[in-house]
Amino acid sequence: EPFKISIHL
């Protein structure tokens, strides 16, 4: 999920 990856970054 791109959204979760963005939060991780």
Curated annotation (Swiss-Prot):
Question: What UniProt keywords apply to this chain's record, in alphabetical order?
Answer: Amidation, Antibiotic, Antimicrobial, Fungicide, Secreted
Naming one, the record's GO cellular component terms include: extracellular region
Tissue expression notes = Found in the hypopharyngeal glands of the worker honeybee.
Q: What are the Leucine amide sites (modified residues) in this protein?
A: 9
Where is this protein localized, as stated in its record?
Answer: Secreted
Q: Which GO terms describe its biological process?
A: defense response to fungus; defense response to Gram-negative bacterium; defense response to Gram-positive bacterium; killing of cells of another organism
Q: What does this protein do?
A: Has antibacterial activity against the Gram-positive bacteria S.aureus ATCC 6535 and S.saprophyticus, and the Gram-negative bacteria E.coli CCT1371, E.cloacae ATCC 23355, K.pneumoniae ATCC 13883 and P.aeruginosa ATCC 27853, and antifungal activity against C.albicans. Lacks cytolytic activity and do not induce rat peritoneal mast cell degranulation.
What is the protein's name according to its record?
Answer: Jellein-3
Q: Which organism is it from?
A: Apis mellifera
